[in-house]
Structures are given as C-alpha cells and as structure tokens.
C-alpha cells in the first residue's frame, strides 16, 4: 500500500469513527479460566484487544451452572489474555449478595465473622471472609474459639490444594461443609457461608498479560 493509500484509509477510519464510534469495535468472546471449566461468560466490545486487558467482568454463578441455589453467588473475573477474538480470564473474587446475607441473620442467633488470608499450594494469595450463623446466641469466648477453628480449616485446606481444587471445593459447598463440622464442635450452627473471596496476589504465570492479534491466517484457519 502506497503512502497515499495509507493516508486515505486512515482518513476513512477517522471519518467512520466520528460518525459512529461502534463501527470500529469488534466483539470478543470471554471465557472462564481452564481451572473453572473454560466456559463461555459473555461477549464484550472493544476497538482493539489491548483495551480488554485487566477489564473485570461480574457474573452470577447461576449463569454458569443454571442452579437456582447459586443465584446469590457473584463471581468476578479479569481478562488477562486475548487470542484473536477470544479473551481468557483469571479468577478475581467471589461475593454473596447483601440481600442473601441479610436473610441469614435472624433474631435470637449470633453471627460469627472471620477474615482469613490464605495461600494455595500453587501460590495464589487470597483474603476470605467467612460467616457462621448459630442456632442461638453465644458469648465472645465461643465466637473466638469458632474463628480459630475456621482459620485452621481454611489455611490448611488452601495449602493442600491448587487454585482449581480450592475453588471447586468452595463452589460445590465442600469447604463450607468442613467449616460447619469444625464450628459446630464449639456451638450449634444453622448456616456457614463463604461470604467473600478477594485475590490479593497472583502467581507469576497468572500475572502475565498477553495479546495475540487476529491475523489473516487466524481467520482462514477458523
């Protein structure tokens, strides 16, 4: 392409973008990380793939599993790799809806909250908030003892698992079952929930962000 042709093409792009900014955008398919099944999450627009990097998406676990009991669970993912029109995410966090948490607390019960920092065996550092609801009111000594139990369970389980195994236990309710068993040795429990997870530090391989541009060869191969 000659310099004159390049200039004309550039001017056409400017004209189009002024008339309709969406004309230069492409739609990218966003997927969950492989350790969460690599399922399709959403389609998002961007004028160039670099602008997708580190963008955060929030979806309900219900959108992935179609299990109604998962409606209160919000998952956060962050795009860190783009390959053509495919964007790959990494897990960023989890949180229960406020309405659901409020529904757990009833008159005559106690709420025991614990915040624990854990590290998986493959190097993910996360802060986890746990919520336990007792069947009746308990004292501060019992609350402290229960927090200690929950701390021990969470740190031990995380250290024994990689991120995929750990999140599988969280999302399938296996981790809360272990916390329930540990906590009820201190006082009778009605419910235990993982209220929030926030990733504090990724392992080196997850820190990297990459973009593989869509090329003519890529389109032809697809």
From Swiss-Prot:
One of its GO terms (biological process) is translation. Keywords: Ribonucleoprotein, Ribosomal protein. One of its GO terms (cellular component) is ribosome. GO terms for molecular function: structural constituent of ribosome. InterPro entries: Ribosomal_eS1, Ribosomal_eS1_arc. Disulfide bonds: none annotated. Pfam families: Ribosomal_S3Ae. NCBIfam families: PRK04057.1 (NF003142). HAMAP family: Ribosomal_eS1. Belongs to the eukaryotic ribosomal protein eS1 family. This is Small ribosomal subunit protein eS1. It comes from Pyrobaculum islandicum (strain DSM 4184 / JCM 9189 / GEO3).
